[in-house]
Regions:
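Structural motif
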Residues: 21-33
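A short, solvent-exposed loop/turn motif at the edges and junctions
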Residues: 40-46, 68-83
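Membrane-proximal, glycine/serine-rich, low-complexity loop/turn segments characteristic
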Residues: 17, 29, 56-58, 79, ...
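Outer membrane beta-barrel strand-and-loop segments of large Gram-negative receptors
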Residues: 364, 498-500, 544-550, 648, ...
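Short, acidic Ser/Thr/Gly-rich low-complexity loop/linker segments typical of extracellular
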Residues: 43-58
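Signature of Gram-negative outer-membrane beta-barrel scaffolds
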Residues: 514-618, 788
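Conserved C-terminal beta-signal and adjacent last beta-strands/turns
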Residues: 759-777, 792-922
Length: 922
C-alpha cells in the first residue's frame, strides 16, 4: 500500500513551460469577463491551450517553451485579436478589444472557442476537449471542466445533479441522464450547453429559486438541418456470450425520433430495476416545498436489487423509443416508450450479528430474478406566446417481476446452532398511471398566475411464499404442525389514488422583490388488503381468517394549505422567507374500528443566498416539515416482511416533525479552473415513526410507534478539483453521522452510524499522448449499538488506475484497474480486483470499427459490502460474473439530408426548452 501511495504522489509528466497573462478590457477600460484566449500550435495546427478571463478581465495561459503558437483573443460582439508568439519566460500582455458591427459567427475563424459564456449558459465545444478515445457522451463530458459523470450514470455540474438532458433543445427520454450518457455516440456531439438556473417554465424563471437546477443541451456536430445518425454494435465471444446494440437517431427542425436497443448477457444492464423506479418521467411532488410530506410506498414486494449492477449472471434486453414533433405555432407533442427485461442470478453469503443477544446468523442465498419493466409517456405542450403556456403529461409505469430464492440459514451461539433450508418466492405486477396538467399565464409586467394538478392511480399486488422446516412464530400463528414443512403464502393488494393541485399567484413588486401566494390541496385515498394461508402436503389450503391475520383498511388523508412567500434581493443577499398554514384530516377504517385525526400546523421556511460573484455563493436553507405515513404502517393485522420478520401496523400513528438546516458553498473559477464545493446538513426528527421490536433468536416481530427520542443526522462534504493545461486533480471528503433509538425487547436500543469517505485522484489530459488517471478511495463505516459494547468497524481501501490512448492510425486502447482491500477491526475479510481492457480500431474515413474487450481479466469471484440497522450489523459477500472476452464490430449509421443550416435563411437553432428567458431579479 505504501508503494501505491508513493505512485499516487509522484509526478507523472514534467516539462518546461511558461505563461502569458494579463487583462482584457474594452477600449474604455471596462473589464471583459468570459473572453476566450486560445493557442494553436503552428507546427501541428492543433489547439494546444485556452483560457477564459475572470470577472476582473484577467486571463492566464500556460504554453510549452520554444514553440511558436498562434494566439487569438475573442469575445462575442468584439473584433478578435490575433498574433504569433514563442515563449521562453513568463510575460504579461493586456488587450483592449474593439466592438464590431457584424456578429462573431460571420467572421471566419479557424478554431471554435472552447468555452463561451452567454448569460446563464456555458457552451463547451466538444472538439476542444476530446482526446480521440471517446465512445459515448459520458466520455465527452468527463473531459470538460466542472462536469462529472458519477457511478450511477448521473451528470453532475458544479456539484449538483443535472435534472434534464436535451438534444437540440428537445428532451431526450424526458431528460434521463443515464440513457443519454450511455447511448449517445461521442462523434455526434458538437457542443455541450450547461443551462444554469434551469426551470421547466420560462415565466417563473425570475420569481423562483433555481440556483441548484442545471440542465444540459447537446448540440449535434453536423450543420445539416436533417440527418440520421447512430450506430449498430454486435459482439460475441467464448461461452456463446452476445451483445447486440442498435442506436438510431433522426433529427430535423420540427421532428426527431430515437430508437435504442440492447440485448446482452455480459452483465451490462442498460436499465436496472433501480433505474426503473427512479425514472419519474418528469413528475414532481407539488407539495414538496409546502412543509408537508406523505410517503406513498412503492415496490413493497421485497424484490432484491443488484449491488452496483453486478451479479453472478445478468441477461438484459432493452427497447426504447423517443419522439418529438412541433410546429411554428408553439405546439409540441412528444413521448417515449421503454421496455426492459432482466434475468439475474444472484449468489451471496451474509454474516449478520445481532446487537441484543450476540447471536450470529450466516445465510447463503441463491436468487433467480425475472423482471419485465415498461414505461410509456405522452406529452402535449402549447406555448403560442411568451405569456401563456399549457402542458399535459401522462405516464404509465407497469412491470412483471418474480424472484425465487433458495436460502440456507445457520444461527445460534457457539456449538448450539440451528440449520434450516428455505424456499422463498415473490411475485408482483405493480402499475401506476400518473397524469399532470399545467397552465401558466402572465398578465402584464407585474402578475403571473400558475395552476398545476396531478393525479396518481397506483396498484401493487405482491404475493410471497415461504417453504421452511421450522415455525419461527409458534405463539403467534396457529400453523398446522402435522406437515413435512411449513408452506406459507401471503397476498397483499394496495390501491392508491392521489390528487394534488395548487394555484400560485406571483406579484412582482419591483426588479428586486416579489410576493408569492399559494393555495393547494393534497388528497390521498388508499385501500389495503392482505391475508395469508398455509398449503398442506396434500394441497389443501388453510386460510387464516381471523382479523389478527387479515387486513382490510381504508385510509384517507387531506392537506389543505395556504402559503405566503416573499423574495427580495439587496446587494449580494437574496432573502426568501415563507410561511405555510396547513389543515390536516387523516382517518382510517379497519373493520368496525374508525380512527380520525384533525390538526392544523404552521410551517416556516427560510432561504438566504449570498452571491459573492456570479460563480461564488453561500446558501443557508431552513425548513420545517410535517411527516405523515401511508396505509402500510397503519394496517394492524400481521404481515410477513421477510422469512424471519412479522410486522403489525399501528392505526393511531401521529405525524412526525422534521427540522432541516442546509449550508452550501460553491466557487467556480473559470480563470484558474479551480472548483470548490462544500456543505453541511443537520436534520432532527421528533415524534418520528420508529420500531418496537420483539426479537427471539433471529426472528422478530415489529410494530411502528411514535418515538419520544429524536432522530438526528449530520453530514459534511467537501470537494476540490483543479485543472491545468494537461493535468486535472480532485480531492473529496464526506462524513455522515446518524443517531436514533428503537425499542427492542422492551429496552431502548440506541444506534449510531458513522461513515467516512475520502478520495483523491490525478489525471492527465493530453490530446496527442496517452492519458492516465490514478486515484485512491478510503472508506470507514462504524456501527455502534447500546446493547453491544463492541464497535463494528469496516474499512475499504481502493486504489485504481485508468488508461486511455489513441495511437497508430485509428487504434484506441482503454483499460481500468481497481484493487479493493476490505477488512474489519479484527481481520481481512476479502480483497478483490476489477480489471477491464478494450482495444478498438477504426480506419480514418471508415464507418466500421472493430474491437476486442476483456472484462474481469483476473477472474476475481466476489465483492463485499457492509451495512447496519437497529438490530444488527452485517457484511455481505456476493459473486460476480467471471472473466469473459468479447469481440465486437460497430457500424456508423450517420446519413445526411436537406440543406446546411447556414444556407437556410428561415432555419434557427432549437432553443433549450425551459430556459428561454423570463424575468429575473436584478
Amino acid at each position: 500500500m505504501k508503494k501505491i501511495l508513493i505512485i499516487l504522489l509522484f509526478p507523472i509528466f514534467v516539462y518546461s513551460q511558461s505563461s502569458i497573462s494579463g487583462k482584457i478590457t474594452d477600449v474604455d477600460g471596462n473589464s471583459i469577463m468570459g473572453a476566450n484566449v486560445i493557442a494553436v500550435n503552428n507546427e501541428t495546427n492543433v489547439l494546444d491551450g485556452f483560457g477564459i478571463s475572470n470577472e476582473n478581465g484577467f486571463y492566464n495561459l500556460n504554453l510549452k517553451n520554444e514553440t511558436e503558437f498562434n494566439i487569438k483573443v475573442t469575445f462575442i460582439g468584439f473584433s478578435p485579436v490575433e498574433f504569433n508568439i514563442s515563449l521562453n519566460q513568463d510575460i504579461i500582455r493586456n488587450f483592449a478589444l474593439e466592438e464590431q458591427a457584424e456578429a462573431l459567427d460571420e467572421v471566419e475563424i479557424v478554431y471554435e472557442m472552447p468555452v463561451t459564456i452567454k448569460g446563464d449558459t456555458i457552451v463547451y465545444s466538444a472538439d476542444a476537449f476530446n482526446t480521440g478515445t471517446e465512445k459515448k457522451l459520458a466520455d465527452v463530458l468527463k473531459n470538460m471542466p466542472g462536469i462529472e459523470v458519477n457511478d450511477d450514470g448521473e451528470i453532475e455540474v458544479e456539484g449538483q445533479v443535472v435534472r434534464k438532458v436535451q438534444i437540440e433543445g428537445k428532451d431526450f427520454f424526458d431528460g434521463d441522464s443515464k440513457l443519454a450518457t450511455q447511448n449517445l455516440p461521442a462523434k455526434a456531439v458538437g457542443k455541450v450547453e450547461v443551462l444554469r438556473n434551469f426551470t421547466e417554465n420560462n415565466q417563473l424563471r425570475g420569481v423562483t429559486n433555481n440556483e441548484d437546477n442545471f440542465a444540459l443541451n447537446i448540440r449535434l456536430k453536423d450543420g445539416q438541418d436533417k440527418f440520421w445518425f447512430g450506430e449498430i454494435t454486435a459482439g460475441t465471444g467464448p461461452d456463446d456470450i452476445h451483445l447486440i446494440s442498435p442506436k438510431v437517431f433522426y433529427y430535423s427542425k420540427n421532428f426527431n425520433f430515437s430508437v435504442i436497443g440492447n440485448s446482452n448477457d455480459i452483465g451490462q444492464p442498460p436499465l436496472s430495476r433501480r433505474d426503473f423506479y427512479r425514472f419519474g418521467g418528469g413528475f414532481n411532488n407539488l407539495n414538496a416545498r409546502t412543509g408537508t410530506s406523505i410517503n406513498i410506498s412503492s415496490d413493497v414486494g421485497g424484490i432484491s436489487s443488484l449491488q452496483n449492477n453486478r451479479a453472478k449472471s445478468i441477461e438484459s434486453e432493452l427497447l426504447a423509443t423517443n419522439f418529438s414533433v412541433s410546429n411554428d405555432k408553439g405546439l409540441e407533442i412528444s413521448g417515449f416508450s421503454i421496455f426492459s427485461s432482466n434475468v439475474n442470478e444472484i449468489e451471496e453469503s451474509i454474516t449478520r450479528t445481532y446487537f441484543t443477544n450476540n447471536i450470529t446468523e450466516e445465510t447463503g442465498r441463491n436468487v433467480l430474478q425475472n423482471n419485465e419493466l415498461e414505461l410509456y409517456k405522452f406529452s402535449v405542450e402549447y406555448e403560442p406566446n411568451d405569456i401563456l403556456q399549457l402542458e399535459y403529461n401522462i405516464l404509465l409505469n407497469q412491470s412483471n417481476q418474480n424472484e425465487n430464492t433458495d436460502l440456507t440459514s445457520m444461527y445460534g451461539r457457539g456449538s448450539n446452532r440451528t440449520n434450516e433450508l428455505l424456499d422463498i418466492g415473490r411475485i408482483q405486477t405493480p402499475y401506476s398511471l400518473n397524469q399532470e396538467l399545467k397552465m401558466y399565464y402572465t398578465a402584464g409586467e407585474k402578475n403571473i398566475f400558475s395552476l398545476e394538478a396531478q393525479h396518481l392511480d397506483q396498484e401493487e399486488d405482491p404475493i410471497g411464499t415461504s417453504i421452511r422446516e421450522i415455525n419461527p412464530f409458534l405463539n403467534l400463528i396457529d400453523f398446522d404442525t402435522n406437515q413435512t414443512s411449513y408452506n406459507t403464502s401471503q397476498t397483499r393488494n394496495i390501491k392508491t389514488k392521489k390528487f394534488e393541485t395548487k394555484f400560485d399567484y406571483y406579484y412582482l413588486i419591483n426588479d428586486q422583490s416579489n410576493i408569492n401566494i399559494t393555495l393547494g390541496v393534497t388528497d390521498v385515498k388508499q385501500s389495503y388488503f392482505s391475508n395469508f394461508f398455509q398449503t398442506f402436503d396434500s394441497g389443501q389450503i388453510k386460510n387464516f381468517s381471523d382479523q389478527l391475520y387479515v387486513n382490510d383498511v381504508d385510509f384517507n388523508f387531506t392537506d389543505s394549505y395556504i402559503a405566503l412567500k416573499y423574495r427580495i434581493k439587496t446587494g449580494i443577499f437574496t432573502f426568501d422567507p415563507g410561511i405555510t398554514l396547513h389543515s390536516y384530516n387523516t382517518n382510517n377504517n379497519q373493520y368496525s374500528d374508525y380512527f380520525e385525526t384533525k390538526t392544523s400546523d404552521i410551517r416556516p421556511d427560510l432561504r438566504i443566498n449570498l452571491q459573492f460573484k456570479k460563480t461564488e455563493s453561500l446558501r443557508l436553507t431552513y425548513r420545517e416539515t410535517t411527516q405523515f405515513t401511508d396505509v402500510n404502517n397503519l394496517a394492524k393485522a400481521y404481515v410477513f416482511n421477510s422469512y424471519n420478520s412479522l410486522f403489525r401496523g399501528e392505526p393511531e400513528l401521529e405525524a412526525g416533525k422534521v427540522i432541516n438546516y442546509d449550508l452550501n458553498y460553491r466557487s467556480i473559477n473559470q480563470f484558474t479552473f479551480t472548483n470548490v464545493f462544500a456543505g453541511a446538513n443537520y436534520s432532527k426528527r421528533s415524534n418520528s415513526i420508529q420500531s418496537r421490536t420483539t426479537l427471539v433468536g433471529v426472528n422478530q416481530v415489529r410494530r411502528p410507534t411514535n418515538s419520544s427520542f429524536p432522530v438526528e443526522s449530520y453530514s459534511l462534504y467537501g470537494r476540490l478539483d483543479k485543472r491545468t493545461k494537461n493535468l486535472k486533480g480532485e480531492i473529496g471528503v464526506r462524513y455522515n453521522f446518524s443517531e436514533y433509538n428503537n425499542i427492542v425487547n422492551d429496552q431502548v436500543s440506541k444506534t449510531e452510524n458513522l461513515g467516512q469517505n475520502y478520495s483523491v485522484s490525478l489525471a492527465t489530459n493530453f490530446r496527442d499522448k496517452p492519458n492516465i488517471e490514478i486515484g485512491y478511495r478510503y472508506n470507514i463505516n462504524k456501527y455502534n449499538n447500546s446493547f453491544n459494547s463492541v464497535e463494528n468497524i469496516f474499512y475499504r481501501e481502493t486504489p485504481y488506475v485508468r488508461v486511455d490512448a489513441y495511437f497508430g492510425k485509428g487504434f484506441v486502447f482503454n483499460s481500468e484497474y481497481s484493487y479493493n482491500y476490505y477488512k474489519n477491526q479484527n481481520e481481512v475479510l476479502n480483497d478483490f480486483r476489477f480489471w477491464d481492457a478494450d482495444l478498438s480500431y477504426e480506419k480514418e474515413g471508415s464507418k466500421w470499427e472493430y474491437s476486442i474487450g476483456v472484462t474481469n481479466i483476473l477472474n476475481d469471484q466476489s465483492i463485499n459490502r457492509d451495512s447496519a440497522n437497529d438490530l444488527s450489523s452485517q457484511t455481505r459477500m456476493y459473486l460476480i460474473q467471471p472473466r469473459y472476452i468479447l469481440f465486437k464490430v460497430k457500424y456508423d449509421l450517420t446519413a445526411f439530408g436537406g440543406s446546411k443550416k447556414s444556407e437556410d435563411k428561415n432555419s434557427s437553432e432549437a432553443k433549450p426548452r425551459g430556459n428561454r428567458g423570463g424575468g429575473k431579479l436584478k
